[in-house]
Amino acid sequence: MDSAVTGLYPLHRCKTLHLVRHAQGIHNVEGEKNHDAYLSYDLFDAHLTPLGWQQVSNLRKHVQAHGLSKKIDLVIASPLLRTMQTAVGVFGREGYTDGIGAPPLMVANAGNSDHPAISSLNCPPFIAIELCREHLVIHPCDKRRSISEYRPLFPAIDFSLIENEDDVLWMPDVREEDEEVAVRGMKFLNWLWTREEKEIAIVTHSGFLFHTLNRHSSIKSEMCKHFANCELRSVVIVDKGMTGSDAAKTDYPGKIPNGLDLPSDVAKDKH
C-alpha cells in the first residue's frame, strides 16, 4: 500500500465539513447580463431569487434523502442575506408555528424572500461568522447590513461571534487580494478546531471556497473548481498538528476486567 496516497488518522482528530455555496442571488442574474451591474448599490446585500429558493428546496431534499440533516452538529453561515437564507432553507425545519417556544430561524418574507417562516425546532445550532465572507472586492452585493437589522429577520441565528455592529470589512475602493482570501480561509479552518462539533455545514461563497481550497495542492484537481449555486461538496479536515483538545470518544481501553493478554507475535519473538 502506497503511504503517499493513503493516510491513517485518529477519528477524534477529524471533522467532516459540508461546504455549500449559496443559491442564486439577484446579483448573479444581473451580473451575468452585465458585469458592470456588480457595481450597483441596487444589489446591496443581494437576496435569493425565486429560482434560488427552488435550488434551496432541491438541495434540502438531497440533504434529507442522504441522511445529512440528522448528522450535522452545527451550521455556519456567512452573515449576508443570500447565505443565511440558503442555510436556514436547506438545514432548517419547515412549518414554523407561533407560540411553540423556539424562535424561528427566519421570519416570513425575510429579505424580500416571499417565503414562509422557517422553524428552528430540533435543529442544530446556527451561527454567523465573518471569516467565511465572500472575497471582499468593491461589489455592494458583498456588503452586509448591520447586525441589528439581521437579528429580527433571523431570530435563531447566533450573531454573538461577530464583533462589529456595522460592516467594517467591506470598502468601496479596496480589493482584498486572492492570497488574503486564502489566508482568511485557513484561519477559518483553524478556528473550527476550537469547536467541539464534528460534522459541520458551512454556507458561504464561490470566491471564498475557491481560494481556500486552492491552498490545498493535494486536492486541486478534484476540488478546486468554482462551485455552482447551491452546490454541496463534503470534505474531511485533519488536525495533524494536534491543536484540538478533543479526547477520543469512541476508543475503548480494553482489559476490563484485567487479564493476561500477551500477543502471539510478541510471544514468538521472545522464543
Listing of model-derived features with the role each one plays in the protein:
Residues 1-123, 127-128, 148-153, 178-185, ...:
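Active-site-proximal alpha-helix that buttresses catalytic centers in soluble enzyme cores
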Residues 42-46, 133, 158-177:
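Short glycine/proline- and acidic residue-enriched helix-loop micro-motifs
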Residues 22, 132, 205:
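Active-site glycine-centered loops adjacent to acidic/histidine catalytic or metal-binding residues
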Residues 111, 133-143:
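Short alpha-helix plus adjacent loop in nuclease-associated cores
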Residues 247-271:
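Acidic, His/Gly-rich catalytic cores of divalent-metal-dependent hydrolytic chemistry
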Residues 140-149, 176:
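Short, surface-exposed amphipathic charged segments that create phosphate/polyanion-binding patches used
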Residues 84, 91-101, 185-244:
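Active-site-adjacent alpha-helix immediately C-terminal to a catalytic or transition-state-stabilizing loop
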Residues 31-33, 140-142, 214-216, 247-249:
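Short coil/turn segments at secondary-structure boundaries
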